[in-house]
């Protein structure tokens, strides 16, 4: 299975096991042998390049609202998951148009990956979508 990770991080490629800054998200990319791409590279990736894509929507996302990010992700990946960023309801402090965009984004993905049981319950109730735990991973 070909897996991709998409974030605002400005790097492309797989993460080696000896990476000097193995944060939780990077550890998951390493364990899954996922190829990371920054959002701005999406237009240059071939159609159906990946079986599964995992996305982290950043806290500062105004620029993503301006583009068809979900359309690009669906073009590149057969299935899409979003990995929760921060605590479960941080996005509710955003301007209303960003809140609506975020909920619509959640509704358009196939799977939501959560940090803990509280977040899992919250996102299941909010979206009625499949939600799974993706706990901290240390390598």
Predicted regions and their residues:
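Polar, enzyme-active/binding microenvironments
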Residues: 1
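Extended catalytic core of nucleotide-activated donor transferases of GT-like folds
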Residues: 4-128
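Short beta-strand->alpha-helix junction loop in the catalytic core
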Residues: 134-139
């Amino acid at each position: 299975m070909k897996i991709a990770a998409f974030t605002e991080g400005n790097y492309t490629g797989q993460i080696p096991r000896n990476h000097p800054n193995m944060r939780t998200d990077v550890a998951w990319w390493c364990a899954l042998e996922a190829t990371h791409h920054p959002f701005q590279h999406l237009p240059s990736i071939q159609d159906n390049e990946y079986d599964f894509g995992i996305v982290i929507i950043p806290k500062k996302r105004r620029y993503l609202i301006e583009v068809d990010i979900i359309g690009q992700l669906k073009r590149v990946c057969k299935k899409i998951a979003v990995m929760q960023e921060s605590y479960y309801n941080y996005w509710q402090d955003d301007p209303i148009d960003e809140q609506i965009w975020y909920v619509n984004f959640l509704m358009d993905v196939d799977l939501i990956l959560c940090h803990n049981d509280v977040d899992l319950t919250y996102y299941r109730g909010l979206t009625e979508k499949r939600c799974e735990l993706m706990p901290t991973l240390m390598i």
